[in-house]
């Protein structure tokens, strides 16, 4: 059923969100709060820039991975027993559209911290409320025409709207202090993520037969592909200077 499709898709993308957004946000908030108390502008800029960089470093490739390999992922994890090919395809569609919102979901966790660190809880509350209202409104308006798939579409779309609202407010209030190098790093992350995507597409095509619905060891082959592609991405990021030891020290 549609509820099951959304449930299984949600379980998969929540794992990516926990790593890309929640983990970075949890670590950065207390350090950022302390920096604001000290009024240390250089430290604030450093923490904000590194938080966004780490968030995008993890969320952009995760997003592309879910979009490109949604069917193979769902098939490998749940394509057994009473879970039919139709169930795999429907769940994969939901996962794909959730995938488009992964960077936004992660960024929301980071950008809201920039307000929380200043003891401003009202702005994140109102933006969260707006996201929920927009999400529900889009889902209700288009549900009859599009079906259950509008729910992940609305979720991703409304979250991106929230990100843009955060960005506008942070810029207008001059709460955003970013290093100039951040934009260069974002360009590198996008470039490496696109390159990783081509490698992933190539690998999925090569092992297409082994990832078939009837294959007994499809989960093993998918795990090998994920490990290979992830290793390629991380090594590439290290070689171009994105993965330095100091990059993980948010202070």
Where are the regions that the model predicts?
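Membrane-embedded alpha-helical bundles of multi-pass transporters/translocases
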Residues: 1-251
């Amino acid at each position: 059923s549609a509820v099951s499709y959304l449930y299984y898709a949600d379980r998969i993308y929540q794992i990516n969100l926990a790593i890309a957004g929640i983990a970075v946000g949890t670590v950065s908030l207390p350090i950022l709060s302390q920096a604001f108390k000290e009024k240390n502008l250089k430290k604030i800029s450093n923490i904000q820039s590194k938080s966004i960089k780490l968030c995008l470093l993890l969320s952009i490739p995760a997003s592309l991975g879910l979009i490109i390999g949604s069917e193979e992922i769902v098939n490998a994890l749940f394509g057994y027993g009473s879970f039919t090919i139709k169930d795999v395809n429907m769940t994969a569609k939901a996962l794909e559209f959730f995938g488009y919102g992964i960077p936004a979901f992660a960024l929301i966790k980071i950008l809201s911290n920039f307000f929380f660190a200043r003891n401003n809880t009202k702005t994140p509350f109102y933006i969260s409320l707006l996201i929920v209202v927009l999400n529900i409104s889009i889902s209700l308006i288009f549900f009859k025409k599009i079906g259950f798939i509008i729910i992940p579409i609305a979720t991703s779309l409304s979250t991106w709207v929230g990100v843009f609202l955060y960005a506008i407010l942070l810029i207008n209030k001059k709460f955003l202090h970013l290093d100039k190098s951040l934009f260069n790093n974002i360009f590198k992350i996008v470039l490496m993520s696109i390159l990783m995507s081509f490698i992933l597409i190539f690998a999925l095509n090569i092992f297409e037969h082994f990832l078939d619905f009837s294959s007994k060891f499809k989960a093993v082959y998918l795990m090998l592909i994920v490990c290979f592609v992830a290793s390629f991405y991380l090594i590439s990021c290290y070689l171009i200077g994105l993965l330095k030891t100091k990059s993980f020290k948010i202070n």
